[in-house]
Amino acid sequence: MSFPLLNLDTYTTEDIFALPEGRRAELIDGQIYMMAPPNRRHQTIARELFTAIDSYIKSKGGSCEPFFAPFAVFLNQDNKNYVEPDISVICDLGKLDDKGCNGAPDWVIEIVSPSSRRMDYHAKLFKYRTAGVREYWIVDPEKNRILAYNFETEDIGDYTFQDSVKAGIYDDFQIDFSAIAKRLDM
């Protein structure tokens, strides 16, 4: 479940890394949000999306690197914001080190879970936009909806799991969500 720990103090990334092994959390503006383990449907969608993105990048000989959670993103290059997007695509490889990504990924995909709904649609939308993420997709299997925000062009696409969704950071890449829906029996 994604909820802040009640504390008047603010936390830092040091507190995140001090959590017991296996506990996942994100840090937004100094507040810790614990994360529930993802369900099978969530993981199936994440796997299908990652595989499609990774295959595309490799087929084009691209220099961008896709990552799936848990992967550390130090969003504002400070110690008050740490997220683990379901999928991150980083094209500036200078942002990468052994701990993760220092700064905004180019493309972020979040797959909505019941416990992450408010975070994905509101807090993360704002944080990703202001941090410099170029493109943000919110994939919501419960609502059969994909919102694709292209922050560079100020476009928002609203799709279903029967549509193909074009990636804004690539000219010739789209993901067929109907194929993913078939895997999920949607």
Indicate where each model-derived feature is located.
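Gly/Pro/Ser/Thr-rich low-complexity, intrinsically disordered segments predominantly at protein N-termini
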Residues: 1-186
